Amino acid sequence: MSKYRIELRPAAVKALRRIDPQDRSRVQGAIALLGEDPRPPGARALQGRDGYRVRVGNYRIIYTIRNDILVVVVVTVGHRRDVYG
């Protein structure tokens, strides 16, 4: 059972649909693991805004953590060249 609940923002859901199926599966697996450990090895705090990022190949998962209510909010997902803009 997950320690943290996962919430996907509409932008993240839309972005996931645009990723090819093989990469999407890997990204979805990484998102699911955030429920167990919201700060896994390799996660980095974002500079200039709240939140964290996790690398999954060439893709990045941008998310925030609500420790008060044990929720990980996935803000967006995208290719590394596009996701930070």
What does each of the following model-derived ranges do?
Residues 1-6, 10-25, 55-56, 64-85:
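Enriched for short, Lys/Arg-rich terminal
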Residues 29-54:
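A short, surface-exposed loop/turn module that caps and links secondary-structure elements
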